[in-house]
């Protein structure tokens, strides 16, 4: 998988893979669950906008991330704060290994 770590307009980190589609989200969530095991929890929000975006909130060590897909970024893992930035960087190290 060709994951790219970028800084988005909010100043936070996002891992993006333009080659993956929305139907790859379950496989990525499974990969995250395998890696983080008991540290990963599901969040409260899941959203779908037909044909243009899909997203799910997850928590790892209580830190909120969004795993989603849209027609601009492809599949992404998005941070919401500085703790999330560090976590996205941790994910990038194992997901690109």
Language model features: what each stretch is:
Residues 12-14, 53-55, 74-75:
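A generic structural signal for beta-strand entry/edge sites
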Residues 57-97:
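Short, compact, well-ordered microdomains
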Residues 1-49:
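Negatively charged, low-complexity tracts enriched in Asp/Glu with abundant Ser/Thr
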Residues 42-66:
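Amphipathic, interaction-prone secondary-structure segments
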């Amino acid at each position: 998988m060709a994951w790219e770590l970028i800084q988005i307009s909010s100043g936070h980190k996002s891992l993006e893979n333009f080659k993956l589609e929305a139907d790859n989200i379950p496989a990525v969530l499974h990969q995250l669950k395998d890696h983080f095991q008991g540290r990963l929890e599901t969040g409260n929000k899941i959203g779908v906008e037909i044909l243009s975006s899909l997203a799910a909130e997850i928590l790892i060590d209580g830190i909120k991330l969004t795993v989603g897909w849209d027609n601009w970024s492809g599949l992404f893992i998005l941070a919401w704060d500085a703790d999330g930035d560090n976590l996205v960087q941790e994910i990038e190290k194992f997901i690109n290994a």
